[in-house]
């Protein structure tokens, strides 16, 4: 494992992820409080009808374990947005191991590029109020996975919202009424043409006091170019990394003039 190359504190090594779960049933006892408002549950269930998953030819059921819970994720290799990537595993591990330090219980969290939803599910299990966002074609599968793993067993039901990077931000996420303690992102940086819009979206969603946690497997030169631009607008700390898997986890605090 590497030592910290540029961060303000010594990063911790990232494990390869949790061991595969056994065959015990999904926990439903969850946190100390369950959603008591039936209207909230009904609203979340109704929202499921708004999102129709892409008609992939095949899905698989993948199993993960975090926070002592068995998490079942429906995935498909036919879409980047329907697969759990290594950065998501690293970010889940960090949230699990630093729950008290991060003060996640009751925290308002937005995840950028939530994909099949593993990070948002773990954050919800840890007691956060989560808004999971992604492109329209993956929202149905995302909502399915969130409800399957959080309904009746987390303090707050996560919300699903469409977010196209750089588009309609003020209309969909008005700063006057919405504030997030944390913005989470994992493996959103790879070889695509929307990196500038991604960075603009990260900047927009962060207000004074917001902490951005970004985990990514670094594969391409464009990943490092994005990191350079990220550091220009965020005070950046390397929290953890794995030399073997090329995964890095950063904390970003938006710079204010």
From Swiss-Prot:
Q: Can the keyword Methyltransferase be found in this entry's annotation? A: yes
Region annotation (Disordered) ranges: 1-40
EC numbers listed for it are 2.1.1.-
- GO MF annotations for this entry? heat shock protein binding; protein methyltransferase activity; protein-lysine N-methyltransferase activity
From start to end residue, where is composition biased (Polar residues)?
Answer: 1-10
Which residues make up the binding site for S-adenosyl-L-methionine? 85, 113-115, 134, 165
The cross-references to CDD domains, in alphabetical order and at most eight, read:
AdoMet_MTases (cd02440)
Q: Does the keyword Metal-binding apply?
A: no
Q: Which UniProt keywords apply?
A: Cytoplasm, Methyltransferase, Nucleus, S-adenosyl-L-methionine, Transferase
Enzyme class comes to transferase
Chief localisation class: nucleus
Question: Which GO cellular component term is one of those annotated?
Answer: nucleus
Q: Which GO terms describe its biological process?
A: protein methylation
Q: How does it assemble?
A: Interacts with members of the heat shock protein 70 families; these proteins may possibly be methylation substrates for the enzyme.
**PANTHER family in UniProt:** HEPATOCELLULAR CARCINOMA-ASSOCIATED ANTIGEN, PROTEIN-LYSINE METHYLTRANSFERASE METTL21C
- Describe its function: Protein-lysine N-methyltransferase using S-adenosyl-L-methionine as methyl donor. Mono-di and trimethylates 'Lys-943' of AARS1.
Q: Which protein, by its recorded name, is this?
A: Protein-lysine methyltransferase METTL21C
What gene makes this protein? METTL21C
